[in-house]
Amino acid sequence: MSLEQRSPHCKPDEDLEAQGEDLGLMGAQEPTGEEEETTSSSDSKEEEVSAAGSSSPPQSPQGGASSSISVYYTLWSQFDEGSSSQEEEEPSSSVDPAQLEFMFQEALKLKVAELVHFLLHKYRVKEPVTKAEMLESVIKNYKRYFPVIFGKASEFMQVIFGTDVKEVDPAGHSYILVTALGLSCDSMLGDGHSMPKAALLIIVLGVILTKDNCAPEEVIWEALSVMGVYVGKEHMFYGEPRKLLTQDWVQENYLEYRQVPGSDPAHYEFLWGSKAHAETSYEKVINYLVMLNAREPICYPSLYEEVLGEEQEGV
């Protein structure tokens, strides 16, 4: 599949629904009447104070399965600890409307980062989460923008961590977080600070599929390098990726790693392991990659460094 889809530049929109569409949100909820009661003057004040002191506006990178994720990882790795203090700074009285709009977008970005951090904790301890919890613990004065914030956070959990946010009680707005495609590779995370790795595993399985179910090792590393994952280099989420692919996932039977018959010097290749065959299917992996390829990390690309900041503060 093509990895060279190009993303348009994102433009601010006054309409909330249109704004959500511009952000590429999927499955966002409609705001309730109670949420819409927040006055525009109160919102404006909170938005200006929360978002003041933001860095330069984000750029619109190219989209695509591997290239989209590479944008997330690259920007995440550039996290600036100073960004966490933005909410305490006061805006200048001479800020023009365009700058105020940008600062508001940055304020929403910070809320998305906070919500991702909150959802990660719920996923690790295997607890459900309700809309009421999210509003009280994270969203707070931004209740009218819950659909945008929740939609973007859910997308982040799915694309970066391979974790689906599923509604289990529509009446009570209750959700559970589960590993994508029925995989159990993240079942032992516990209440620590380990990051879910299912998304990376799914991409590796997908690369194997594109090579007639048997991918040379160098092809795997070339594909992962587009995402900022390099052999022998410690990764912020996955640790040392070579160990993860050639030892951990091999021992768990998600991957098979073997020498190419007759190769001299020795070359190695990856295949699906028995557990991958048991827990998921070719069709599910292909559909997941199609979903990744449709994502466009536009408008809030620097969100991902903010989420890392939330994680670092929690350590």
From Swiss-Prot:
Listed Low complexity bias regions: 50-67
InterPro entries xrefs: MAGE (IPR037445), MAGE_N (IPR021072), MAGE_WH1 (IPR041898), MAGE_WH2 (IPR041899), MHD_dom (IPR002190)
Disulfide-bond pairs as recorded: none
GO biological process: negative regulation of transcription by RNA polymerase II
Residues of the MAGE domain: 108-307
SMART domains registered for this protein in UniProt: MAGE, MAGE_N
Classification via Pfam families: MAGE, MAGE_N
Superkingdom as given in the UniProt entry: Eukaryota
GO molecular function list: histone deacetylase binding
Tissue: Expressed in many tumors of several types, such as melanoma, head and neck squamous cell carcinoma, lung carcinoma and breast carcinoma, but not in normal tissues except for testes and placenta.
Keyword vocabulary terms for this entry: Tumor antigen
Biased composition (Basic and acidic residues): 1-13
Region span, Disordered: 1-67
GO CC annotations on file: nucleus
PANTHER family for the chain: MELANOMA-ASSOCIATED ANTIGEN 9, MELANOMA-ASSOCIATED ANTIGEN MAGE ANTIGEN
Its biological purpose: Not known, though may play a role in embryonal development and tumor transformation or aspects of tumor progression.
Protein name, as recorded: Melanoma-associated antigen 9
Species: Homo sapiens (Human)
Name of the gene: MAGEA9
